[in-house]
Swiss-Prot record:
This is Adenosylhomocysteinase. The gene is ahcY. It comes from Cupriavidus taiwanensis (strain DSM 17343 / BCRC 17206 / CCUG 44338 / CIP 107171 / LMG 19424 / R1) (Ralstonia taiwanensis (strain LMG 19424)). Substrate binds at residues 61, 136, 196, 226, 230. InterPro entries: Adenosylhomocyst_ase-like_sf, Adenosylhomocysteinase-like, Ado_hCys_hydrolase_NAD-bd, NAD(P)-bd_dom_sf, S-Ado-L-homoCys_hydrolase_CS. GO terms for molecular function: adenosylhomocysteinase activity. May play a key role in the regulation of the intracellular concentration of adenosylhomocysteine. Keywords: Cytoplasm, Hydrolase, NAD, One-carbon metabolism. CDD domains: SAHH (cd00401). It is an enzyme of class 3 (hydrolase). It is found in: Cytoplasm. Its EC number is 3.13.2.1.
Amino acid sequence: MNAVTDLKQDYLVADINLAGWGRKEIAIAETEMPGLMAIRDEFAAAQPLKGARIAGSLHMTIQTAVLIETLKALGADVRWASCNIFSTQDHAAAAIAAGGTPVFAFKGESLKEYWDFTHRIFDWADGGTPNMILDDGGDATLLLHLGARAEKDQSVIANPGSEEETFLFAAIKEKLAKDPSWYSRNLAAIRGVTEETTTGVHRLYQMAQKGELRFPAINVNDSVTKSKFDNLYGCRESLVDGIKRATDVMIAGKIAVVAGYGDVGKGSAQALRALSAQVWVTEIDPICALQAAMEGYRVVTMDYAAEHGDIFVTCTGNYHVITHEHMAKMKDQAIVCNIGHFDNEIDIASIEKYEWDEIKPQVDHVKFPDGKKLIILAKGRLVNLGCATGHPSYVMSSSFANQTIAQIELWQERDSGKYPVGVYTLPKHLDEKVARLQLRKLNAQLTELTDQQAAYIGVKKEGPYKADHYRY
């Protein structure tokens, strides 16, 4: 790895010479992202993000490059880091850096580098601060809030509970020693955040409930055209892509255990069953468990599944769904991976003491005391981005169109009082707009209501067509 490390240079990527390759793939991705490109075309002249200085923390992929260039086309200034140490596509990062956007990301970052890079998206070259955050997983939002609390009371960063927190707390202490008011100064300047994923949304709601959230947030994840498409259809294609690239394993006939049957779990289970795996599901929620059972999946506990499964996939957004005890029961050569945002769904920390043998990047054999070996993918982090390239461009177009619309909404309404501190979702008509834009690529033909039909069901002919509480 020959990352650029000159701090006078306002980017840090693996190899800037990869920019040409990245640019070619970005051009292809644009043809597969109709919703996002239509938003770019619609708003470019109006420049609705003029004056916005966006600190972005989201997987630095080819698709994200199209998002970044859309935000810039609409008037924003942008700085970017990846939200995962393994998810960056180095040619995408190089292309964005070569185009003049400060980006700090390369595949295989250390945790120290990760938190250093997350800090750098807030350090504008002119000495100013950002005024918006675009987040995935909530780390950028967490950093400012936790750092501001630590300015007043460093006991909040005194006792790390994980390896991740060890590096985060150390990074905050280092920054406070250099600039004691850095966090509160940046926090005060932020006018809003748009959050991409389930895990980050959970954090936002927790902060809001505790009265800790300091600026308005739009929950992009729960837009229907995000969660029911990215989370479900995206995972349906990218999960097995990651497993196959990493292991070349035959999935047919094997017992695949999917932990969690939300949208991500549903897509993951469909993908594995499509390749003729015997799919078992673990769930805590009786409604989701019933859905899984009605789809023909066997619903079991992880305690039971551990000794039977061949492939394990966590999809919960929760903590220690697969424990050391579970892994100790597993078969020799069982494959263990995660497609939730953070690496603590699997208790990776408990097996770090064992012998790890790297088979290839992000694929490790972990030898247990009894001699058996488990195949751990992406060290428990996102398997579809660590071992493959994530979701296809088309489905990310829906997600990133929502992100762009949410950034416009918060920025345009920053002084109107429409969004006091809290967590919001985009209105239904914007969700439907994204779907309409995406349909163009598929040559779909929508039926139009007649006046009589619209009156009969009590909606406008142009929509929205469903109540906010409708479950798609």
